[in-house]
Every structure is written in C-alpha cells, then in structure tokens.
C-alpha cells in the first residue's frame, strides 16, 4: 500500500483538515478551495499557484488527501479562477503545463492588462517542461527585465525570486500550497504569506521546513 504520509509531519504538528494555523510569517488553512475561500486569502496582493493540471492529476491530489473527488477538472479550474478573481491580486503567477496552459493564458489575458509566459522546468530536470504564466495590471518597476532574468530557470528558483523580488513587502498567497515552497521562501525573506492546501500531510511539510530552515 502506498505511503502518502509525507514524513508523518501532520501528526507531529497537529495539522488536520479544517485547521487554521499561524506558521512563521504566514497564515494557512487546510481546506478545499472548491468549497471555501478563507477571508484571509483576500489580503494577498501577489498570488502564485501551481494547481492540478488535468483530470488525472486532480484525482491523484484528492486520492492522496483521502478525499472523494466530486468535481470534473473543468469545474475545479473554473473555481480556481473564481478564487483568484475574488482575491484580485495585483500580480498573479500560475504554473502551467501542456494540458492546461491554453486555459490559463485565456484567463490571465482576460483578467490582466499584461501577460508574460516564462518557460521553466521542475524537479531540476529540463526534460520536465512547464510554464509560469504571469499577469499584471500595472507593471512593477523592472518587470520586463525581471521576466527575462528568470526565463528558463527551474520553477523552484523562480518561486524563490518571486518571493524576494516581486512586491516583496506585500502579502503573497498560494491557493494550492502543497509542501509549501511559496511559504518557505516567503518566510526566508521575512515576507507575509497566506495559503490553503487540501492535504494536511502535504501542508505539514511546510511546518517542518520552516522549523528546520531546510527544504
């Protein structure tokens, strides 16, 4: 049987479904974004999110969280976009893949005045292609140069650069925190962050990372 405990940190830190926590410089909740958008998420002026990218990927996320999947991927994506609209960030980054990039680009180009598509890869392997689709209504100082500087970087490095350089005094939010790269790097920079995550086992990894200061 597969082990999806992610190190067992949920038990160590008492992270449970529905729980809301202060951790480092951030505030997070273990919840399903298709069911609720916590009020505190609306404080995010910058959003970065790496959401499930297909029906199979979405099913895997719910299976690992021990939650029955009730929605089709198209409905999940619609709800994600609605959450971003409610937050109304000044800058939004959505990590995308071949299976969902067209939908993401359509959303970003509709909701924001300017769009940039940054080529990237994940797990430190250039064969694992992805794209960071960014939207802004008012370009931050040095925006175009920054986008060029991170082009082709590993997505982990791009997240680090976003946390340190893009409106660094503002709150950054992540609707699908996973194991918490956004929270980890925001905390490293002393930056406030907010986030939600479906799976308490995955979210609890962030607690361990912040405690140890290591990924």
Q: What is each residue range found by the language model?
A:
Residues 1-215:
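Class I S-adenosyl-L-methionine-dependent methyltransferase catalytic core
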């Amino acid at each position: 049987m597969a082990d999806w405990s992610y190190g067992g940190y949920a038990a160590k830190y008492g992270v449970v479904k529905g729980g809301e926590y202060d951790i480092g410089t951030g505030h997070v909740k273990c919840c399903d974004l298709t069911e609720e958008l916590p009020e505190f998420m609306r404080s995010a002026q910058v959003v970065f999110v790496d959401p499930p990218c297909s029906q199979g990927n979405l099913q895997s996320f719910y299976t690992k969280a021990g939650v029955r999947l009730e929605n089709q991927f198209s409905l999940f994506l619609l709800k994600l976009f609605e959450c971003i609209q409610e937050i109304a960030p000044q800058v939004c980054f959505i990590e995308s893949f071949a299976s969902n990039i067209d939908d993401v680009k359509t959303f970003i180009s509709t909701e924001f005045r300017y769009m940039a598509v940054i080529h990237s890869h994940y797990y430190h392997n250039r064969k694992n292609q992805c794209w960071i689709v960014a939207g802004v209504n008012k370009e931050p100082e040095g925006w175009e140069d920054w986008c060029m500087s991170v082009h082709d970087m590993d997505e982990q490095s791009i997240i680090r650069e976003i946390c340190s350089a893009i409106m660094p005094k503002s709150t950054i939010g992540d609707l699908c925190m996973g194991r918490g790269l956004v929270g980890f790097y925001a905390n490293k920079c002393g930056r406030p962050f907010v986030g939600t995550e479906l799976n308490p086992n995955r979210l609890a990894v962030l607690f361990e990372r912040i405690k140890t200061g290591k990924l």
